[in-house]
Structure formats: C-alpha cells, structure tokens
C-alpha cells in the first residue's frame, strides 16, 4: 500500500510503508547526479599538470561545519607518498561554494544534496561520489514555543529552500496539520540564526549543527524536535565532483573517493579523532563541538544502488 508519510520512512514523499528513506534518497542521488562509482567514464588528460604533486592534487571546497568532517579527515590522513593530495578551499556560504564547484574553480565539494540536484536540473555537470554523513541536523525554538501550533504566524528560519532542513520543517508542519501558509519561512545564514533567535527576530530554526548547539550554549533556545523522528537517518550533504574534472582525471577522482570513504570509516571508529579534527578546522568551543558530534554519523558513506 502506498501512502504519503513523513514519519521514519520518507520526507513527505509518496512511498511504500516500511521503505527505508536512506536507500530511496540514494536512488534519487544516483538517478540525478550520475554517481561516479557506477559509471565508466573515459579517461582523458587534457591540461595535464606539470608536476607530480599537481598531478595528484584535488581541490575540495567546504564550509567549516561538522558535516564536512570527512573532507577534513581525508586531508589529515593523507600521506606524502599517497595517491591523493588534498587542497582544502574554505567558503563562507553555499552560493559561493556552488559557484566555485559549478565553474570548475574547485574539483569537488562537500555540498547540500539538494543544491547539487538543482545544478543538475539546470544542466550543470556535477556528479555525486559519496554521502557526507547521516543525521547532524537539529530543530531549535525559543523557550516560549511548546508545540508546533505555537509557531502559527511566526517566523521560522532555514538555511536554504533547497535543503534537507526545509524538508524537515515541511514534515514537522504537516504532522501538526499545518503548512507553509501558517508559518513565515525565511532563509537565513546559519551563523546568524542563534542571534536572531535570541532577539526574537525568529521563533525557531532548522539547521545543520553546530548552529543549534550554539543556541543551547547561549541559553536562548531549546531542542524542539528530533529530526530522526521526522526522517530516520536523514541526510543533507554529499561529496560532489565537477564533471569535467572527473572526465579529465577519472582515476584521481576515484582515488580521492576511496580515501574519503576510508576517512569516514576512520571517524566512525575513532570518536576522539572527530573532536580533534573538528577543533582544528572549526572555531567553536569544545562543548558545542562535542554536542554537535553526538547527533551526526559517518558510518557507511558509500552510495550504492
């Protein structure tokens, strides 16, 4: 029997009861992105680099948040004689990062799945290689909000309309018999959300960690809804390559993907390393990082059909 559901199985899509959303989302990614692991691309070395170091360098874009931790770990675990050299390129917003990926300024990126799908729909050649993580999202409200109904007529922030965080809000509202017409959904940069909540500009927000834990640390918000109850093993990020880079350096793209997946396994097996690497790449205090890492997973990041 098919029905529309938001609980456990899927983010408000028509699915069969009991289907696992993670697998469904894998198939969406595979169908739209052209997953590197399942496609035999031709290998053509146009614009071949001049040095051995350049030959094995992959420029990877990221935002400094826990969701990019596998990228950081890949860099930390690389060796001088390894098959891949990682050059990390930091950006301050998703639009900047996507512009760099789409135009080939970087070779790959840790990016919101929905933004990659949108790029494909616009005819831009980007290709997914792996998941970024599972979970790691949080819904925060001010202390006066005690039910979804309390959000009627109030402003609620999301990082982007094309995001898992928006899907989670849609599910939350639908479960309560509400819709976007009942709540003012606003786009806002995640770093601005905790402060906006504290001054009453917004009543709550759905976001990737650590920006929920920041509000908890400030004492201005509370956890309102466990996203896992809305969408089990929800995902929002993926490792995505620029398509031209894959065509011209296919073996290198595959080598980096393997190193990335190995890094995810390492993180899953070494929780202490998660904190150490996070502290190096993210400017948050230890309690915020520790709280953030409790709700994010890095096990089994491979995309499989």
What are these regions (language model features)?
Residues 3-20:
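Short, Lys/Arg-enriched N-terminal segments with co-localized hydrophobic residues
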Residues 111, 207, 241, 248, ...:
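A conserved hydrophobic position in a structured secondary element of the catalytic/binding core
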Residues 131-141, 221-249, 253, 257-260, ...:
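Periplasmic-binding protein-like
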């Amino acid at each position: 029997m098919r029905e529309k559901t938001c609980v456990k199985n899927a983010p408000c899509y028509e699915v069969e009861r009991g289907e696992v959303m993670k697998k469904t989302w894998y198939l969406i990614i595979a169908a739209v992105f052209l997953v590197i692991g399942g496609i035999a691309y031709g290998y053509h070395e146009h614009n071949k680099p001049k040095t051995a170091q350049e030959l094995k360098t992959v420029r990877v874009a990221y935002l400094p948040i826990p969701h990019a931790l596998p990228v950081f770990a890949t860099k930390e675990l690389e060796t001088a004689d390894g098959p891949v050299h990682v050059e990390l390129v930091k950006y301050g917003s998703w639009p900047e990062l996507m512009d760099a990926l789409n135009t080939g300024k970087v070779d790959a990126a840790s990016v919101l799945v929905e933004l990659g799908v949108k790029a494909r729909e616009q005819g831009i050649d980007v290709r997914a290689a792996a998941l970024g993580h599972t979970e790691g999202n949080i819904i925060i409200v001010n202390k006066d909000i005690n039910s979804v109904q309390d959000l009627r007529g109030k402003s609620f922030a999301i990082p982007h309309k094309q995001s898992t965080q928006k899907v989670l809000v849609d599910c939350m509202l639908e479960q309560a018999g509400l819709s976007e017409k009942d709540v003012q959904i606003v786009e806002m940069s995640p770093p601005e959300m905790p402060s906006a909540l504290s001054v009453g500009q917004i009543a709550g927000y759905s976001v990737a960690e650590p920006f929920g834990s920041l509000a908890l640390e400030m004492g201005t918000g509370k956890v309102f809804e466990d996203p896992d109850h809305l969408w089990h093993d929800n995902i929002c990020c993926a490792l995505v390559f620029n398509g031209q880079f894959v065509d011209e350096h296919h073996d290198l793209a595959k080598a980096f993907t393997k190193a990335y997946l190995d890094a995810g396994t390492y993180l899953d097996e070494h929780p202490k390393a998660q904190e150490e690497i996070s502290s190096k790449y993210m400017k948050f205090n230890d309690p915020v990082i520790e709280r953030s890492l409790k709700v994010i997973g890095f096990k089994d990041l491979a995309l499989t059909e």
